[in-house]
Amino acid sequence: MERGKMAEAESLETAAEHERILREIESTDTACIGPTLRSVYDGEEHGRFMEKLETRIRNHDREIEKMCNFHYQGFVDSITELLKVRGEAQKLKNQVTDTNRKLQHEGKELVIAMEELKQCRLQQRNISATVDKLMLCLPVLEMYSKLRDQMKTKRHYPALKTLEHLEHTYLPQVSHYRFCKVMVDNIPKLREEIKDVSMSDLKDFLESIRKHSDKIGETAMKQAQQQRNLDNIVLQQPRIGSKRKSKKDAYIIFDTEIESTSPKSEQDSGILDVEDEEDDEEVPGAQDLVDFSPVYRCLHIYSVLGARETFENYYRKQRRKQARLVLQPPSNMHETLDGYRKYFNQIVGFFVVEDHILHTTQGLVNRAYIDELWEMALSKTIAALRTHSSYCSDPNLVLDLKNLIVLFADTLQVYGFPVNQLFDMLLEIRDQYSETLLKKWAGIFRNILDSDNYSPIPVTSEEMYKKVVGQFPFQDIELEKQPFPKKFPFSEFVPKVYNQIKEFIYACLKFSEDLHLSSTEVDDMIRKSTNLLLTRTLSNSLQNVIKRKNIGLTELVQIIINTTHLEKSCKYLEEFITNITNVLPETVHTTKLYGTTTFKDARHAAEEEIYTNLNQKIDQFLQLADYDWMTGDLGNKASDYLVDLIAFLRSTFAVFTHLPGKVAQTACMSACKHLATSLMQLLLEAEVRQLTLGALQQFNLDVRECEQFARSGPVPGFQEDTLQLAFIDLRQLLDLFIQWDWSTYLADYGQPNCKYLRVNPVTALTLLEKMKDTSRKNNMFAQFRKNERDKQKLIDTVAKQLRGLISSHHS
């Protein structure tokens, strides 16, 4: 029963579900009925549902039938009416068709026109859109064209600015166009191209600057020279209120424009062509020579591109290389001044450029970099000058070099470079200059001394007299009173040497100019150099003349006279130096001239040479002596050679009248002593082994001739018999042997007032031995004669006693 109730309940639920599904089918769109039918198939009551569905369809059919039956009459009436209007409708259709055909025929052209109008409208719209787009793209294209033009004309920095505007302002507005994408892709290449081209311009500029540094430096040094000349004029003609030019005014003005509208400034390589100006026109400034726009452009371009440090490093590296090239002097620089000038011009040009870059750019170069380069340049320049100047043997070239170095230093000092080391080096070159002057003046003195005739200067008129006195400070009242013609006591080399000493002093003074030295330093330099000239150069020249083999007594006498007058002129040289340096001789540490010593030494050397020369002449005469030491004849006159010798001495001493008295007296005494000594040696020489009393008698006549010459007073100033004392040894020796006064000699020997005080026992024994041998040889039978035997015994006895004196003296 319960099962039946459950079946009934299920049947009711199924029926309700089917009813719901049917309502849903009726109310749902056919396209969406699938899910509803899916629920039916998912169930198990398909048959019942179909029954329900058929039942529902039948119900609807009945309702439709009822409705149709209700409206059937109206439908029939409507059909009847429709049939009635069908003919009219056909007529209307025909009319409409005909009208349409006519309209189609008539509107065909209109349609074509409308189609054309449509196309025109479309074209107009496209043109308008195209114009709008072109107006948007045109600035981009114009900027790109401008960029190309700027690059073509090498206006790289403006081109870079244009490229920035193009990239950041214009291209973003039209970035969807394909050509813009091409431009965007090409921008890095353009930047690199600008970078490369600007670097190429910089390289051209650097190369051109390197080649034209000579011209730049020459211009700078000319301007420095003009400024110095102007300052000298101002100093010589001071004016109230005048102002010295500032350092900045002395700078060379450069063209500092970064951009220029002229094509020339855009295409230059750094150097502009300048025609040579006339000498009397203003020296062109460096703004007429140099355009630094390539440097500025490249610097700005690299700064904009973020590569400024790369540019700075490259620029400094290249300039360092160029500095090393500039500082390397040519091997033949020392041969001409132009070699030094070109070397200095290049260095000045280099640093003028760097100084300008320092003052016109922000950090491209800095003071530390400039100072480093200058230190290197200074050391290399000084080393090069030391090396090459040492080859200079021409003092004029050394002087010109000094002036060039001073101008070089002054030029760089204007630009703020320290140049003290250059002036210190000039002091070294000053010593070298002094040496070259000494060598030059050695040749001058040699020529003067070689060409001199060593004769007093004759003058025949007042003009000639004044001319000589004007050349050499000489005053002699007695000579002035003498009538013309007359002679100066000195020869021509005296005024010539004196004037050359003054010329040397002038030459030394020239070197000291512009060295920023005090008057005391200049005076000290001149005095030291002059002392070297006197004590070394002139002294050597005089000594060489004095020591010449062919020098004569007349020349030596004249040299003594000349040096005496030159010695007196030293005080005038002191005054001359004082006048040109304005430093009084009494100033502390003032160096004194050593001219007096120089001329005294030369005079003493000449005196010694006179003595030597006289002795040599005496020796030459003595070589003519031809004594017959074995003669038994007694002569009655002096030997011929001695007579000639005495005549020579008389004529020689007659020339000594202008010599100082002591010199003539010393020469005469020296000659007599040498003659006496030579005669004594002649008498005692070993080759003369034997001699006779007759030979001694002849020798005695010769000695008497010498004594007669001494008594005649060949040179004034000797006291009575003073000159005869030169022959006293010979006289006493000869008297001893001729008078055979041995008893007196032996008895008085050793006493202060001995008659034969000057006779040495050794000398007496030597001569006695020669006479003893002669006596034995020539008197073979003398032993048989009592007188001869007694004489021989006496000789032996005297000889024995002499030996005793000698031995006692030695003991």
Curated annotation (Swiss-Prot):
**One GO process term, biological-process aspect:** exocytosis
Query: Which Pfam families does this UniProt record tie to the protein?
Result: EXOC6_Sec15_N (PF20651), Sec15_C (PF04091)
Gene3D superfamilies in the record: Dsl1p vesicle tethering complex, Tip20p subunit, domain D (1.20.58.670), Exocyst complex subunit Sec15 C-terminal domain, N-terminal subdomain (1.10.357.30)
**What are the record keywords, sorted?**
Coiled coil, Disease variant, Dwarfism, Exocytosis, Protein transport, Transport
According to the lineage, what is the superkingdom?
Eukaryota
User: Which PANTHER family does the record associate with it?
Assistant: EXOCYST COMPLEX COMPONENT 6B, SEC15
Q: Which disease is it linked to?
A: Spondyloepimetaphyseal dysplasia with joint laxity, 3: An autosomal recessive bone disease characterized by multiple joint dislocations at birth, severe joint laxity, scoliosis, gracile metacarpals and metatarsals, delayed bone age and poorly ossified carpal and tarsal bones.
Name assigned to this protein: Exocyst complex component 6B
